[in-house]
Design a protein with these regions (language model features):
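N-terminal secretory signal peptides that target proteins for export/translocation
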Residues: 1-19
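Flexible, solvent-exposed loop segments that connect beta-strands
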Residues: 98-102, 170-184, 233-253
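Surface-exposed short loop/turn segments
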Residues: 140, 144-224, 228-234
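Bacterial N-terminal signal peptides
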Residues: 21-37
Length: 316
């Protein structure tokens, strides 16, 4: 109901307030986006989740020490042997090293660590059998005086048969620290045969060969290769007022950077599992009494080699 007692000034004030309110409502709607951006009230787009890069490096290069079953007095047998760091060959390339073989470079690094541990344990094993052991040496780096001063050379060589399926693309993945990558998976099998040798040191002629077949194991592996962003073009973005700007657009391209790879870890785990078996077999095969019985045969081979015109490893 209209109040007849309202005075003139009060009526004018109410009229002015109504006009201001009607004008302010659309203005508020116009200003809201800007105010919301400034105050942080606009809904923010959630950042894409970033996956953690799996850690396959833990314990990669550590191998268990071999517990010696017994120990004789060092040097009590009266036989000097050269201890050689274990070597490997690949069935595909028939050569050692990672080049042109089925081992990745990181797998080859794992084997070198394994070989270092095994070389030290084999030397300790020989000493525990009462032998005088020198080494461990790399076979090609043994000097002539060391060869000449030894009765026998002890060598362990591992033949790997490594087979892969074709790696299949799984997905694109955004990783931590703003890294982008492509994830692949596949299967591989690793077969192992260990050969134990006794050599005459100077000629490197084989006195005997014994074998341990460790069979083959199958694995599922996964790796991710990194990608890098690059400027792929530009895109015009309107400012809503008849103008606008050109902004660069970006895309991803592949690189050779490996973000992670489970194969070296799987390889390391298999070597860890095989380690006690091959060391226990070495303890059995490298028998001090048998080696002592071969000393005269080794001397015969050395004399025959020394009288020949071809002297591999001897100074001219």
């Amino acid at each position: 109901m209209r109040n007849e007692n309202e005075t003139g000034p009060l009526k004018k004030f109410k009229k002015a307030s109504l006009i201001i309110f009607v004008a302010a409502v659309p203005l508020a709607f116009l200003l809201f986006p800007s105010l919301a951006v400034l105050t942080g009230c606009m809904p923010q787009q959630a950042a894409a989740p970033q996956a953690q890069i799996p850690d396959f490096n833990s314990g990669l290069y550590s191998f268990p020490k071999f517990e010696l079953p017994a120990a004789k007095k060092p040097g009590s047998v009266g036989l000097t042997v050269l201890s050689i760091v274990p070597e490997y060959k690949d069935t595909r390339s028939e050569t050692g090293g990672a080049a042109n073989s089925s081992m990745t470079k990181d797998m080859a690094k794992v084997f070198r660590s394994f070989a270092g541990s095994a070389g030290e344990d084999i030397e300790a094993l020989l000493v525990a059998k009462g032998l005088t052991a020198k080494g461990p040496f790399v076979l090609d780096e043994v000097t002539f005086p060391d060869k000449k001063g030894a009765d026998l050379t002890v060598l362990m060589q591992i033949i790997f048969d490594i087979q892969y399926s074709d790696a299949k693309f799984l997905r694109d993945e955004a990783f931590e620290n703003n890294q982008q990558g492509k994830v692949y998976s596949g299967t591989m099998s690793i077969g192992m045969k260990v050969y134990y040798y006794l050599l005459e040191p100077l000629s490197e002629e084989k006195m005997w060969i014994k074998k341990l077949d460790l069979g083959s194991q199958d694995y599922n592996y996964e790796f991710a290769k990194g990608q890098e962003s690059y400027v792929s073009g530009q895109q015009f973005v309107s400012d809503g007022c008849g103008g606008g700007h050109n902004y660069p657009t970006y895309a991803w391209r592949d690189t050779n950077k490996m973000l992670y790879d489970s194969r070296p870890k799987l390889f390391s785990d298999q070597l860890k599992d095989a380690y006690p078996k091959l060391m226990k077999t070495a303890w059995t095969y490298f028998d001090a009494d048998e080696m002592l019985s071969l000393r005269d045969k080794a001397k015969e081979i050395r004399d025959r080699w020394g009288s020949s015109s071809y002297r591999r490893g001897a100074p001219q």
